[in-house]
Amino acid sequence: MTAVFVLHSADGTTDPSAFRKQAFGECDPFARHREIAWEGPDAMAAGRIRFVGEFDVARYPHIETLIVVEGELTLEAAGAAPLVLGPGEGAVIGVGTALRVAAESRVLVMFCAAACTKPTKRGLFALRADADFKPSASLPAEVLLGAAPQCRSDNVFIDDGAGYCAGAWDSTPYHRIVRPHRVNEFMLLLAGSVRFAAPDGSVLSLGAGDALFVPRGAPIGWESSERVAKFYVVQNVTVSTERE
């Protein structure tokens, strides 16, 4: 299946050839540590970061969601208490945020970043598996193969300047047809498992601890038989996000 980019497999089978070492923009604070699996025309990228050490950033240059899968990462925004992230925890950093980043030993982090020349939100925002879930819209009947699911979400961060939204989401089981994905979407599964189907009939099965990226327009289906929870980032690419 080529529609989905697997960024991390909890069972340790992640393909290292799927990544290339590359900075995200000219002022990337993780330039020496970043490995990109997907970068699109809408100034968004997804992949992983392997990091140990510390640094300070006076003004974070882009929007970035970071989710730890191995080790411990400390993020400290100016004037705020340190945010210590372990496996299965994450945070979103807004453009312009003054930040200290530290890891005493090597940490493996999934990322989804987006450039934004006209940001609307600054700061550091925690992502938690025990999110403040609220009922959210279900799927239209015409794309479902069975009963409509009950969905909940907690939108932790929204920046209208990049069409970027990050948070947590969960749902009861459902089965959806293969259709073009309507947004760029990063996911890290927190609970449950999903069978992602391609038009050729192939299926990719992913579960808790796995991370993936689905580009806008990629044809993909969804089938789950249990509650699924995930951290997510979505980008509405109708918003212009070109770098200056």
Which residues are covered by each model-predicted region?
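Ordered, small/hydrophobic-rich secondary-structure cores
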Residues: 1-91
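Short hydrophobic/aromatic-rich beta-strand segments that constitute the beta-sheet cores
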Residues: 75, 110-111, 178-179, 196, ...
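A short, N-terminal "cap"/entry segment at the start of jelly-roll beta-barrel domains
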Residues: 1-43, 113-163
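Short acidic-glycine-tyrosine-enriched beta hairpin
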Residues: 79-96, 200-217
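Ligand-binding loop in jelly-roll beta-barrel domains
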Residues: 95-120, 216-240
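Conserved hydrophobic/aromatic beta-strand scaffold that supports enzyme active sites
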Residues: 46-48, 65, 90-92, 166-168, ...
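Short, conserved beta-strand element in jelly-roll/cupin
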Residues: 60-75, 180-196
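Conserved short histidine dyad/triad with adjacent acidic residue
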Residues: 29-35, 40-60, 152-182, 215-216
